[in-house]
Amino acid sequence: MCAESAKICARSRRHSIDDLLSEIHTRAQQYYFSEQIAELAYQALIKEARLTPKPGLVDSTNNGSHQDMSLSTFEQSAIALRPFFTQFVLMGIETTNLPDSHILSKIRPLGLQAEQAMFVATNQVNTHKGAIFAFGLVCTALGRHFSRWQNKMMSSPSFEISQDTTGISLISETVARFTQGITDELKNYSKNQPLTAGITLYQQYGFTGARGEAEKGFPLVQQAVVFILSQAESEMRWYWALLYLMANNNDTNIVHRGGINGLQFIQDEAHKRLGNAKNLQNANALMASLREFDDDCIARNLSPGGSADLLALTIFFLSLLYC
């Protein structure tokens, strides 16, 4: 409640019973909200992993273009990451008064801890590094907004994300402010530093990958959400979202494996399927088309892992609208 030692406060009875009860209530609200968000994030990762079929990606039928991971690897990874999503939300609450520009450096250590937990759970396999980055930022932004709502409780009876896309845009804009200038890490690369895959792809093609998507406030995810909401309610909507993301995302995971030609193949094939009304509206036709696409991706050793991360975030954002 204050900067003083709890022992000293207790002896002097500095805080009234009402103040103590109010503080307990506030902290309970914060933890409950953080747990709610963490569960939605966890469920989004699980739903994305289990969605089948997914071209080139691990699903319940096969391991896609991967030899070192399976569906159970992703499930174990998601379990390991769930507590960290809670901590990201709480971090957003605790740092609510800090400038936006200070947040990234504050949450980076927690992100690195989450990565280590992932590697322990998966026996050193990178299942969710991109998701940790995206969800860490979004969960922190949600915590920040929740804390600011708590400070205005008298004028608003409950905290909720807008039932249209306004709330999603607000959270995404906050992430953009958190990450402003993050792509400078690619632009101002020192020749004395190790040459990473991300740096190489930026130098060759100007692709900014996950950094660029976050810095712009996840425009592809926001577009995918709008695309889904513009369609009739259907159990196939997550497949539509995945195809939309694959068609429009300059996925550095694909370029790393298959070069610019591999990316062009993925985008062209996804666009083709999005343009086929029969595929979109007929479940059997869509499943058959996706299985064919999956076979082609596996044959070319292509995996749209970046789009998979964005799909998980799309699922998460949609769940916020309906929770």
Curated annotation (Swiss-Prot):
<dbReference type="InterPro" id="IPR017551">
    <property type="entry name" value="TriPribosyl-deP-CoA_syn_CitG"/>
</dbReference>
<dbReference type="GO" id="GO:0051191">
    <property type="term" value="P:prosthetic group biosynthetic process"/>
</dbReference>
<comment type="function">
    <text>Catalyzes the formation of 2-(5''-triphosphoribosyl)-3'-dephosphocoenzyme-A, the precursor of the prosthetic group of the holo-acyl carrier protein (gamma chain) of citrate lyase, from ATP and dephospho-CoA.</text>
</comment>
<dbReference type="InterPro" id="IPR002736">
    <property type="entry name" value="CitG"/>
</dbReference>
<dbReference type="GO" id="GO:0046917">
    <property type="term" value="F:triphosphoribosyl-dephospho-CoA synthase activity"/>
</dbReference>
<protein>
    <recommendedName>
        <fullName>2-(5''-triphosphoribosyl)-3'-dephosphocoenzyme-A synthase</fullName>
        <ecNumber>2.4.2.52</ecNumber>
    </recommendedName>
</protein>
<dbReference type="GO" id="GO:0005524">
    <property type="term" value="F:ATP binding"/>
</dbReference>
<keyword id="KW-0067">ATP-binding</keyword>
<keyword id="KW-0547">Nucleotide-binding</keyword>
<comment type="similarity">
    <text>Belongs to the CitG/MdcB family.</text>
</comment>
<dbReference type="Pfam" id="PF01874">
    <property type="entry name" value="CitG"/>
</dbReference>
<keyword id="KW-0808">Transferase</keyword>
